[in-house]
């Protein structure tokens, strides 16, 4: 008989000294906690192998789901590899967003400049595709050689009478969060400076990218009690839809890391108030739906919303009880991009009778970590911008049974011999709303209680 041993033995792993301020054991605020000297939302420590992506990546994942937009990457062809299907975003209409274009800058262009090549690429797209809007992304090399993409885009707009929006996203200018801001700036530029007194009785849904059709789940919920969605930013959205966004009465923001900047700009320019929401998990889905109904609805809409929530919860409660019995007492580790998702995941695990023993994000802010501290138990490891070495250390130290993360974390979990759940934007199954809560419980049960772990 083969003597199976753990894939990785526990060992004394240490973290980089400069990273210690971004790692905190929850002591329930006896020393100031995450509201004290906890360091987050800063540049990554050099050499720490941060899991964050570049500025261009951040801008691209936000803008790419606009279904009828053309995306032109001004840079080497390698940058254009990060294009097709980078999110599992679905469309109810156009599929243009699944195509991508590149100026394919070479050594000669680096020396003599790439503006003429960019202008020619725009000319070709207009001649062959007749676009309504083109987003032009600056990459690292463009930031180095100093091509004036603003001037090229402005000239193209005047020449063709269409929108050509520069996205200032050279990768070395920051991290993925900087790219989010670049994308928000591009969206504001697209919507323009004109204000309007005309309002539509509905909401804009910011920070949902229609992964596996999740935005359709939520919009169908809202329709049940009479709330219309004016524009979706940016999952399953279109140019015409986005141009209507300034007319909405309320912005709801799910992924605050990527879209809070836009929500604040829209409040300042168009007078649209915003609220944070999350449709991950039974608890947050309920709270978000009732909050929206309370703000926008009359007494009848609020009544319908409460009735809808009760009906949906009753449909899945028995099945959730089944999974609670199988998962009770298990320990979870979380490392995701956005803090809103981490907060919802902690609540979901708690609802399933599981304890979160480690939680980290790539883009969390101080107030996000204060919330995380308040809803986790004493001893939970809280960390910002972690690297694989740190994840390994605290997963082993805390005895986690499962890691929830993205594709970059999957190999680490399997090497450590623990279960894994993909909650990133590459996934193809819905985890939002009530149906998503049930799907999540099923997936956690399948991976934690898989017989494969008997052989590890």
Swiss-Prot record:
GO BP terms, alphabetized: nitrogen fixation; protein-containing complex assembly
Q: Which GO terms describe its molecular function?
A: nitrogenase activity
Q: Does the keyword Secreted apply?
A: no
* Highest taxon of the lineage: Bacteria
Record field: transmembrane: none
Associated pathway? Cofactor biosynthesis; Fe-Mo cofactor biosynthesis
| Protein keywords | Nitrogen fixation
The family this protein is said to belong to: Belongs to the NifD/NifK/NifE/NifN family.
General function of this protein: This protein may play a role in the biosynthesis of the prosthetic group of nitrogenase (FeMo cofactor).
Q: Know the name of this protein? A: Nitrogenase iron-molybdenum cofactor biosynthesis protein NifE
Point out the gene that encodes the protein: nifE
């Amino acid at each position: 008989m083969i003597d199976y041993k753990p894939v990785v033995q526990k060992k004394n792993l240490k973290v980089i000294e400069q990273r210690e301020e971004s790692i905190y054991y929850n002591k329930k605020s006896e020393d100031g906690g995450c509201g004290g000297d906890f360091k987050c939302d800063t540049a990554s420590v050099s050499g720490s192998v941060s899991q964050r992506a570049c500025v261009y990546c951040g801008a691209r994942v936000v803008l790419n789901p606009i279904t009828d937009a053309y995306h032109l990457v001004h840079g080497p062809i390698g940058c254009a590899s990060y294009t097709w299907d980078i999110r599992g975003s679905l469309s109810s209409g156009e599929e243009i967003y699944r195509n991508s274009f590149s100026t394919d800058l070479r050594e000669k262009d680096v020396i003599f400049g790439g503006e003429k090549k960019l202008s020619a690429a725009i000319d070709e797209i207009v001649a062959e595709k007749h676009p309504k809007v083109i987003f032009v992304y600056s990459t690292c090399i463009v930031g180095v050689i100093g091509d004036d993409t603003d001037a090229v885009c402005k000239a193209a707009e005047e020449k063709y009478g269409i929108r050509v929006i520069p996205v200032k996203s050279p990768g070395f200018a920051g991290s993925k969060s900087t790219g989010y801001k670049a994308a928000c700036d591009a969206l504001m530029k697209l919507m323009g400076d004109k204000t309007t007194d005309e309002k539509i009785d509905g909401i804009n849904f910011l920070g949902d990218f229609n992964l596996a059709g999740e935005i359709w789940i939520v919009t169908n919920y809202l329709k049940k009690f009479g709330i219309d969605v004016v524009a979706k930013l940016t999952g399953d959205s279109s140019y015409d839809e986005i141009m209507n966004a300034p007319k909405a009465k309320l912005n709801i923001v799910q992924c605050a890391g990527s879209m809070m900047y836009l929500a604040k700009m829209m409040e300042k320019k168009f007078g649209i108030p915003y609220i944070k929401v999350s449709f991950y998990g039974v608890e947050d889905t309920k709270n978000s739906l009732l909050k929206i109904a309370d703000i926008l609805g009359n007494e009848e809409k609020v009544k319908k919303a409460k009735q809808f929530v009760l009906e949906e919860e009753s449909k899945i409660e028995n099945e959730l009880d089944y999974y609670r019995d199988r998962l009770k007492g298990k320990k979870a580790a979380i490392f995701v991009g956005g803090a809103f998702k981490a907060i919802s995941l902690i609540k979901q695990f708690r609802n399933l009778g599981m304890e979160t023993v480690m939680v980290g994000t790539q883009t969390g802010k101080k107030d996000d970590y204060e919330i995380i501290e308040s809803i986790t138990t004493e001893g939970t490891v809280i960390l910002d911008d972690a690297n694989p070495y740190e994840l390994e250390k605290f997963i082993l130290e805390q005895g986690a049974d499962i890691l929830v993360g993205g594709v970059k974390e999957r190999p680490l979990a399997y090497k450590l011999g623990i279960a894994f759940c993909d909650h990133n934007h590459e996934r193809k199954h819905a985890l939002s709303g009530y149906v998503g809560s049930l799907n999540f419980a099923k997936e956690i049960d399948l991976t934690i209680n898989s017989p494969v772990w008997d052989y590890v």
